[in-house]
Regions:
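A membrane-topology feature that recognizes alpha-helical transmembrane segments
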Residues: 1-157
Length: 157
């Protein structure tokens, strides 16, 4: 339905994810405008992919559940607020099953990133535990999910 719009929206998402991952690596923060742009661009993505009103409601419901679950991690001090918002914004782009796949990939990448940071801490014999820029894992998992055509078939559900 969306023809040429779909690749441009996917490219915009890719650029936003790259910028968010780089920003998180440098500053341990993700700007609210990036997460807002990711979330808002999901609306034309839905239209371009021909989602019905019911499908859009499901997308929104899944994103709200994802936000609530990861908000609990934020409250527990295990994850930053920008990370939580980015995960929920990405959930708006993906069919429910693909959200689960993206979260599994994100967890594996985040675990690997954590191990790298722990190894670096041990190598430098640093006493303080560095914050993990989890936005990197979220961004890569999101890029993989959008790039994988088996995960993003909206009309097949």
């Amino acid at each position: 339905m969306g023809g040429i719009v779909v690749p441009w929206l996917a490219l915009a998402l890719l650029l936003l994810l790259v910028m968010a991952g780089i920003e998180d690596a440098r500053t341990r923060e993700i700007a609210n405008w990036k997460n807002a742009a990711i979330a808002l661009l999901a609306l034309p993505w839905w239209w371009a992919n021909g989602l019905s009103g019911i499908d859009m409601a499901w997308q929104l419901g899944v994103a709200l559940i994802v936000f609530a679950l990861f908000f609990a991690a934020f409250v527990a001090g295990q994850m930053g607020g920008g990370d939580v918002k980015m995960i929920a914004a990405l959930a708006l782009w993906l069919p429910p099953g693909a959200v689960l796949s993206m979260l599994m990939v994100m967890s594996l990448l985040g675990g690997a990133l954590t191990l790298l940071f722990l190894a670096d801490r041990w190598r430098r014999r640093a006493a303080q535990v560095a914050e993990i820029p989890y936005g990197i894992a979220i961004a890569i998992a999101g890029m993989l999910a959008i790039a994988n055509p088996f995960l993003t078939h909206f009309g097949d559900a």
